[in-house]
C-alpha cells in the first residue's frame, strides 16, 4: 500500500484530511475516486473548495491539478456545485 503523500498534489495537510475520513492509501483514493473522496472531505471540512477537488483528481491522474483538461474541470465544478 502506497503512502498518500507520494502522490502529486497531495501534501501533508491533504493527506491528513484524507486519512481522517478513512482514505489512508493511494490505492483507496484511486478506488473511490476524486468525487467521493471530496464529498467525504467536504462533509468533515465544510470549507473545502473546488481546488481541493481538482487536486484529488490530479493526484489520481498523476498530473498537476492545473493540467486537468477543461472538460474535466467543468465536470468537477458541476459536481462541486451540486453538493
Where are these regions (language model features)?
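Catalytic DNA-binding helix-loop module of base-excision-repair DNA glycosylases/AP lyases
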Residues: 13-21, 36
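C-terminal structural segments of small proteins and small subunits
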Residues: 53-83
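Feature detects amphipathic, helix-rich regulatory segments
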Residues: 1, 31, 35, 74, ...
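Extended, structured, electrostatic nucleic-acid-contact surfaces
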Residues: 1-9, 15-16, 47-63
Amino acid at each position: 500500500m502506497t503512502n498518500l503523500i507520494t502522490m502529486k498534489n497531495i501534501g501533508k495537510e491533504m493527506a491528513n484530511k484524507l486519512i481522517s475520513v478513512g482514505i489512508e492509501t493511494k490505492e483507496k483514493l484511486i478506488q473511490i475516486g476524486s468525487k467521493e473522496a471530496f464529498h467525504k472531505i467536504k462533509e468533515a471540512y465544510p470549507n473545502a473548495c473546488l481546488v481541493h477537488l481538482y487536486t484529488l483528481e490530479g493526484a489520481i491522474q498523476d498530473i498537476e491539478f492545473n493540467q486537468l483538461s477543461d472538460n474535466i474541470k467543468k465536470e468537477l465544478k458541476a459536481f462541486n456545485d451540486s453538493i
